[in-house]
Every structure is written in structure tokens, then in C-alpha cells.
Amino acid sequence: MRPLTSGLSLLVILSGGVAGRVAGQEGGAVSALEYEGWRQYSVHCARCHGQDALPNPVAANLLVSMAPGGPAADKAAFIKVVRDGRPERGMPASGGVMTPEQIEAVYAYLKGRAEKRIPAGRPKEPAEQPKQESKG
């Protein structure tokens, strides 16, 4: 009975490791700002707009809205909509919940998704930048 248990344990460990690597590789490399945007989007926006900002019947298609020429492609227009909301369409104002920096980070993430630079899925967390020593 012991070899079977060990074999099953090994199989579970190996399959979990492979699944973890695949899931981690699903999204592409992003900037620190885009990664923070993904984090903020996941907390504040995904409930209605979907985890990957894919089209759905509940909320606006952000990939179309944020694409070049779209109604929210302009950064100022995007910030205004997020800050003030669109009550007539059921979108709440987030200006009192999100900081301007958080809104700008979400803009960077969604812009990358709309421009197809950032694939669906959890983006790969950017590596920490080495600190530069000051000369003096």
C-alpha cells in the first residue's frame, strides 16, 4: 500500500506544479504600473466587467471602449467615467473609492488589454528593479 500512496502523492505534486506554471504563464510580462492596474481592476472592476475585461452582457465591452478611437480610449475620458460613474448605465462612481493613482493604473492595464499587448489571465508580476546607487 505504501508504494501506491507515494506514487499518487508524486502524481498530485507533479500535476499541481505543471498547472501552476501554466497558469503563471497565461498572461504576458507587464510593467509595474500595468500589474498594479490588473490588481486594482480585479478588486474594483472585475465584478461587473469580468476578470479579463472580456465582453459580457452586464457591462460595457472595455476592450472596444479602450481601443484606439473608442469612447474611453482617451485617458481623461476614462478617468472621468471611472471617477464620476455612468449612473444612467448602472456604473457607480469610483472616485471616492479609488485614488487617482489607482485609476491611472487601471487605465494602463486596460489600454494594454485593448491594444492586445496584454493577454487575458493573470499577468506575470514584473521583476523588482535593481536599486541604482547614487554617485557622489
Model-predicted segments: where are they?
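Short, intrinsically disordered, low-complexity terminal segments
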Residues: 15-16, 20, 43
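His/Cys-centered metal/cofactor-coordination and adjacent catalytic loops
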Residues: 20-33, 46-68
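Flexible coil segments in periplasmic/lumen-exposed cytochrome c-class electron-transfer proteins
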Residues: 24-31, 39-43, 92-136
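Sequence/structural segment immediately N-terminal to covalent heme-attachment motifs in c-type
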Residues: 30-52, 77-84, 136
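Extracytoplasmic electron-transfer domains, predominantly the class I c-type cytochrome c fold
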Residues: 56-57, 63-115
